[in-house]
Amino acid sequence: MATQTVNETSRTRPRRTGIGSYLKPLNSEYGKVAPGWGTTPLMGFFMVLFAIFLSLLLEIYNSSILLNGISVSW
């Protein structure tokens, strides 16, 4: 036989902790998906804002955008 059965008495049960009991309700929704798009449009909006922010940083770094009164010397 290729498989070996492990004795059931050797398995230990997970230890219950106070923080685990406190966080269990947060994990009770695991695997459940709300119908519809949910907050996907909001996430897309913030992704666009983040992309704009990163492009502004890149343009400032490349001196494509000149900031008056701020000397940039790398």
UniProtKB/Swiss-Prot annotation:
Phosphorylation is a light-dependent reaction catalyzed by a membrane-bound kinase; phosphorylation occurs on Thr residue(s) in the N-terminus of the protein. One of its GO terms (cellular component) is chloroplast thylakoid membrane. One of its GO terms (biological process) is photosynthesis. It is a single-pass membrane protein. The chain crosses the membrane at residues 41-61. It is found in: Plastid, Chloroplast thylakoid membrane. Keywords: Chloroplast, Membrane, Phosphoprotein, Photosynthesis, Photosystem II, Plastid, Thylakoid, Transmembrane, Transmembrane helix. The modification Phosphothreonine is found at residues 3, 5. It holds the Pfam family PsbH. It comes from the Eukaryota. GO terms for molecular function: phosphate ion binding. One of the components of the core complex of photosystem II (PSII), required for its stability and/or assembly. PSII is a light-driven water:plastoquinone oxidoreductase that uses light energy to abstract electrons from H(2)O, generating O(2) and a proton gradient subsequently used for ATP formation. It consists of a core antenna complex that captures photons, and an electron transfer chain that converts photonic excitation into a charge separation. Belongs to the PsbH family. PSII is composed of 1 copy each of membrane proteins PsbA, PsbB, PsbC, PsbD, PsbE, PsbF, PsbH, PsbI, PsbJ, PsbK, PsbL, PsbM, PsbT, PsbX, PsbY, PsbZ, Psb30/Ycf12, at least 3 peripheral proteins of the oxygen-evolving complex and a large number of cofactors. It forms dimeric complexes. This is Photosystem II reaction center protein H. The gene is psbH.
